[in-house]
Amino acid sequence: MKQYLDLCQRIIDEGTWVENSRTGKRCLTVINADLVYNVDKNEFPLITTRKSFYKAAIAELLGYIRGYDNAADFRKIGCNTWNANANDNQAWLNNPHRKGVDDMGRVYGVQGRAWSKPDGGTIDQLRKIVDDLSKGIDDRGEILSFYNPGEFHMGCLRPCMHTHNFSLLGDTLHLTSFQRSCDVPLGLNFNQVQVFTLLALMAQITGHKAGTAFHKIVNAHIYEDQLELMRDVQIKREPLSSPKLVINPDIKSLEDLETWVTMDDFEVTGYEHHEAIKYPFSV
């Protein structure tokens, strides 16, 4: 939790104002931030200086794992984060590749499960990684990438957290996740939960111990309409102890994640927090 607040303070102290053309707002911005999550110790990085909700973040991750491309599918599993980008983003509404209400296009999980090949076929990146790791194989290329510039025009949003690189050392699995851009007050809370949970799940379904997750962010920013709440409220609160994430031990395969797993299979224990803060969201 301290590393999160340290990043927020760094942005406030050292950040540069940058105009964001997509949102029409200014962002206080720093370049390069590194966060580390001790998955092996189950120090779940759920923000404690404001009330935070983990289930929507895990639901979104589950939707990516399943390759969902429709906001309605995300809603069914408890995640509403794609409603605005699918239906309120004017550039996407005018895009000829949009198939209709709730369509997200070829974003995130679609790329992870069905990356298009020149011959017309697709590559299931996640399946390959799971198969390798289950056999104890790390070919130094166990990489899940959502970043496909050739199809950016076919989706409502470029991926922010775009690449997950798995590394197997002995019987311990580690993860390095790369993020090009991060809305620190709102998005990072989601992203931290997802990086942690992705490593925990992948270790569980491939039969390994979970090690450390490394989260690398390039552009870390606070929007101008979020700054006052962060600077004058959240950052002044004392962080509390990290909670624990409990995952149903019956989840043993990628097929389980694709079929029957729900948010009831995840529980956070020992979560103490300060009062909620409602930050503005920028579409």
Swiss-Prot record:
GO biological process annotation, one example: dTMP biosynthetic process
Transferase in keyword set: yes
Pathway participation: Pyrimidine metabolism; dTTP biosynthesis
Residues annotated as binding dUMP: R22, R180, S181, C182, D183, N191, H221, I222, Y223
Record has Transferase as a keyword: yes
Positions with a binding annotation for (6R)-5,10-methylene-5,6,7,8-tetrahydrofolate: D183, S282
Subcellular location: Cytoplasm
Record's protein name: Thymidylate synthase
General function of this protein: Catalyzes the reductive methylation of 2'-deoxyuridine-5'-monophosphate (dUMP) to 2'-deoxythymidine-5'-monophosphate (dTMP) while utilizing 5,10-methylenetetrahydrofolate (mTHF) as the methyl donor and reductant in the reaction, yielding dihydrofolate (DHF) as a by-product. This enzymatic reaction provides an intracellular de novo source of dTMP, an essential precursor for DNA biosynthesis.
Highest taxon in the source lineage: Bacteria
Subunit structure: Homodimer.
Family: Belongs to the thymidylate synthase family. Bacterial-type ThyA subfamily.
Catalytic function, reaction form: dUMP + (6R)-5,10-methylene-5,6,7,8-tetrahydrofolate = 7,8-dihydrofolate + dTMP
Single Gene Ontology MF annotation: thymidylate synthase activity
CDD domains: TS_Pyrimidine_HMase
EC number: 2.1.1.45
Catalytic center residues: C160 (nucleophile)
